[in-house]
Amino acid sequence: MFVEKRKAGKNIKYFLVHSYRENGKVRKIRKYLGQNLGKEELKETKDKAKKHVLGILQELKTEVFLFTLTKNQINKLNKYENKIKIMHFDSREWQRFTEEFVFNTNAIEGSTVQREEVPDILHKPKAEGAEEIETKGVAKAVDYIKKTKEDLSIELIKKLHEICFNGSKSFAGQLRSVEVAVVDSKGEVLHRGVSVSDLHLALKDMISWYKENKQKFRPLVLAAIIHNQFEYIHPFQDGNGRVGRLLLNLILLKSKYPPLNITLENRAEYYRTLQEYQKNQNLKPTVEFLVKQYKKTITKVTTKQGKV
């Protein structure tokens, strides 16, 4: 910030000026201080004006964990929701969605269960083996987020993990006590989860941010932020992807939006959007990707026989 002096006839007018960058353009906030001010009077009015300018700046941007978004950037992200159709599923469509979601979310993580096997597994009285347990578990978790009145919390996050993996993983429902990393097929580290010592605080910060800022963002953008930040934290030893995609849908359902499905065939693009968020704090690719997935979900679920 700096003081700008302007001559106006025989008078000198003073302004406090602050420059900032938004979307590659330099913008200015200019606050009038007065005219013909003495040294002490200028200092006093400058200090008051500085607080006012800082307040304006605070309103213009929102902290989003490791980065900030300006009001203009938030508005642009929120407009992506105009590209999706808001509708409500009937019981048959919910069944179709659940089967599609269960298959894809597990397959993304390496499950060998085929799409056509899912209905039979869900109707079996008892699951056989870890993959069938997780098939039934994820379906139960979908039903849970559909019905629950609970809002986002650490306990809810742990509950979803327990529902998905009870019987298949010894640590179901428990936050990890070991360090974790996401590696690619070559064994190269793509992302390291938050350290164990910071894990609980990171989750608390995520939930506090959600409660404080959820009115600023449209549901799809809000869901994208929480999903990406959850994956950044990586609070479980395993199963973070599936719980993250459930949380994404929990937030959508809380806002009376239909759920969406991220498909196996789009896994590579999905991972790229996460990398953009984690490495470059760029949320736009995720929101654009989710819009496309939303359209595919609606078509798949509402078309007769679930065929596109």
Report the location of each language-model feature:
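FIC/Doc superfamily catalytic core
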Residues: 1-238, 242-308
